[in-house]
């Protein structure tokens, strides 16, 4: 059974004027390696820590500024939100299609809230806590191309023509602000699009981004802004002592107009200085150590890296299943081809390398979790190929071969073929990232023994479910397994309304 909304009644939760307060007992374990009976033993000790959560339920008017607004992802997301807001339907060769938010965790997935008369009861994910209605988001942003959003939508060739015609009047007046352009960080083939760029030294570029955010916020009368990078994949930045290793050195490097500071890092720097959440949707190392240090010191939310949309999402499910079933993946070969601008940019070796790193690390935590299957340091062979094929456009093709060792020396091979519209997978993920980033800024918590409430760590690991290479606070384990990431996110939001984690034990029926 599906219910639209619910209210929690419990001594552990209190609904007040503009906020929800909850008390939550976090059940975890503590491991110690100690001498017992003359030898070292591992001892696991159950541990309970009481937390208090406080969530501001006043939902703000939200502005979203996209870096790369005129690209396939930015134009597709903007078009999709307008189509939903206006209730637009359009004719395809198969049917009359209604606008929807399919593919969005927050808008189109559900959570289990209990059982009633022997039937499982589910509710929308978004019913857990008050979230921004995506129909009410105000969009803006930057792009190195000055093409308006209606023409950019046509250039992307993602949405049906009938829908494009209906959306054009809404999008023709939407024109991106000039963006930061450094040809050294992206493929040379992007130069033909770069007719809308911010001139001047890096310090001046950062100030221009700050001014743009302030002017957008004032002009559109929005209470909060979230900035998200959905522009070209950049090459990796060199990590250099004295350049970007500390906050102080990074700021000094900007003053000197050092070449080895990427455009994405400049956008992130501007957002941190302005106290605006910044999410990186591409695989490059935007968050150099100096930026992370600065975000932590200023308590300004940063998240990323790289949208987890198609092939990698499947991989983080399948490898988790195989290793969890006691099957040993020994070879993973992933091949992709696509024909959109992302594919063209990735045809350059230096930008492909960023994507290769992002895709390659996705199985690491699953492999290291099973010392029965893998010796220390052992890892499956993992090869990734991406090719640019202009004819297929946004229709990305992904082929994967998983070879595993099974019982008594046997072999198992699984082959997957996945065809999808790349931007139609990415757009709802962008939506989820900005909605959850905004929501997380309204949640505060404190553990027993702490005197004051505080926000989540500014390095927003809560966004891991949506990222190929999750950014986590220093010293925090990286989790890539999709089911664990979703459970983490859902259970944190459940804790905010005093609900226990969903553990699927269903003991009442055992």
UniProtKB/Swiss-Prot annotation:
InterPro entries to which the protein is assigned, alphabetical: Myo-inos-1-P_Synthase, Myo-inos-1-P_Synthase_GAPDH, NAD(P)-bd_dom_sf
Cofactor: NAD(+)
Transmembrane residue ranges: none
Organism: Spirodela polyrhiza
Binding-site list for NAD(+): 70-73, 143, 180, 190, 193, 230-233, 281-282, 306, 309, 340-342, 355, 393-394, 422-423
Chief subcellular location: cytoplasm
E.C. no: 5.5.1.4
Superkingdom assignment: Eukaryota
Function: Key enzyme in myo-inositol biosynthesis pathway that catalyzes the conversion of glucose 6-phosphate to 1-myo-inositol 1-phosphate in a NAD-dependent manner.
Protein name: Inositol-3-phosphate synthase
Family: Belongs to the myo-inositol 1-phosphate synthase family.
SUPFAM superfamilies named among the record's database cross-references: Glyceraldehyde-3-phosphate dehydrogenase-like, C-terminal domain (SSF55347), NAD(P)-binding Rossmann-fold domains (SSF51735)
Biological or metabolic pathway of the protein: Polyol metabolism; myo-inositol biosynthesis; myo-inositol from D-glucose 6-phosphate: step 1/2
């Amino acid at each position: 059974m599906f219910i639209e909304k619910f209210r929690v009644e419990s001594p552990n939760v209190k609904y007040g004027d503009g906020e929800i307060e909850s008390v939550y007992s976090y059940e975890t374990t503590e491991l110690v390696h100690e001498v017992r009976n003359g030898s070292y033993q591992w001892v696991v000790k159950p541990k309970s820590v009481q937390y208090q959560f406080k969530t501001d339920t006043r939902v703000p008017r939200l502005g979203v500024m996209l870096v790369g607004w005129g690209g396939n992802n930015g134009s597709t997301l903007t078009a999709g939100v307008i189509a939903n807001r206006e209730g637009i339907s359009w004719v395809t060769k198969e049917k009359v299609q209604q606008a929807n938010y399919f593919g969005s965790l927050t808008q189109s997935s559900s959570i289990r809230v209990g059982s009633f008369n022997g039937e499982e009861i589910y509710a929308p994910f978004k019913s857990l806590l008050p979230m921004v209605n995506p129909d009410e988001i105000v969009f803006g942003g930057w792009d190195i191309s000055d093409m308006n959003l209606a023409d950019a939508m046509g250039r992307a060739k993602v949405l049906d023509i009938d829908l494009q015609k209906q959306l054009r009047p809404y999008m023709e007046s939407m024109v991106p602000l000039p963006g930061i352009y450094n040809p050294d960080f992206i493929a040379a083939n992007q130069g033909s699009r770069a007719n809308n760029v911010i001139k001047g030294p890096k310090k001046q570029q950062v100030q221009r981004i700050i001014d743009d955010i302030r002017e957008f916020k004032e002009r559109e009368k929005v209470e909060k802004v979230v900035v998200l990078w959905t522009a070209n994949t950049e090459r990796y930045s060199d990590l250099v002592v004295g350049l970007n290793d500390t906050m102080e050195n990074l700021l000094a490097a900007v003053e000197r107009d050092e070449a080895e500071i990427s455009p994405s890092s400049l956008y992130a720097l501007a957002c941190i200085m302005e106290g605006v959440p910044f999410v990186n949707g591409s695989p490059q190392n935007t968050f150099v150590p100096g930026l992370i240090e600065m975000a932590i010191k200023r308590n300004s939310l940063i998240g990323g890296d790289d949208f987890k949309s198609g092939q990698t999402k499947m991989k983080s499910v399948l490898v988790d299943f195989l290793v969890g079933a006691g099957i040993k993946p020994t070879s993973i070969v992933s091949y992709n081809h696509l024909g959109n601008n992302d594919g063209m940019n990735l045809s350059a070796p230096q930008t492909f390398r960023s994507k290769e790193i992002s895709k390659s690390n996705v199985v690491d935590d699953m492999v290291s979790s099973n010392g029965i299957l893998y010796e220390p340091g052992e890892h499956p062979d993992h090869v990734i190929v991406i090719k640019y094929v202009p004819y297929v456009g946004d229709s990305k093709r992904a082929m994967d071969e998983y070879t595993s060792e099974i019982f008594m020396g046997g072999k198992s091979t699984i082959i997957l073929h996945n065809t999808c519209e790349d931007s139609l997978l990415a757009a709802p993920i962008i939506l989820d990232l900005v909605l959850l980033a905004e929501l997380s800024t309204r949640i505060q918590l404190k553990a027993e023994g702490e005197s004051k409430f505080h926000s989540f760590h500014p390095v927003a690991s809560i966004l891991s479910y949506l990222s190929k290479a999750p950014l986590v606070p220093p010293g925090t384990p990286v989790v890539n397994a999709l089911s664990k990431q979703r459970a983490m996110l859902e259970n944190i939001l459940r804790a905010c309304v005093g609900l226990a984690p969903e553990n699927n034990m269903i003991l009442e029926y055992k």
